[in-house]
Amino acid sequence: ALPPLLLHSIFSGSVDALEHWINVRPNNAVTVLDTHDGIGVIDIGSDQLDRSLKGLVPDPDVDRLVETIHANTQGESREATGAAASNLDLYQVNSTYYSALACNDQHYLATRAVQFFLPGIPQVYYVGAMAGANDMELLKRTNVGRDINRHYYTAEEVEENLKRPVVQALNALCAFRNTLPAFDGTFSYQRD
């Protein structure tokens, strides 16, 4: 639930659903924002078989979240999601996390900071580690929606990306998270 909840908070300015999830989530988890698949919006909405079982975010807000991702990616995620891209999984939006945030470095690093500072073990997918944008060339070659988020980096591309300020800041955040003893302690927070 964390990936779409953070997007919802960034896009809407509301942290209510995120705060609720923080209060009920497990402490012994691997935290992720991106994987080889898309962004699982089903995790925060109503039960698909019984709409009376409400989710963390009201369904109209989930719909707005999906449309905001489509707008932020200039329609790339729409091209890669659902039947349009040989993808029958309609409960996720196929996009890199960075592209879902309109390639906004500040928003990307803010969401990563929340991920890293929550209890658990943060995992960063290799495309996320490069703050990678949607791979439309690969999508066009394969017509597999999830391939938008599966760029094959050459050694040269890795070297170039490691010089980008957003990737350097992400690596610094990783080092901070992994070396500070406070992250081995007990978690608490207070909402202002």
Which residues make up each language-model segment?
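Active-site and adjacent substrate-binding regions of carbohydrate-active enzymes
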Residues: 1-192
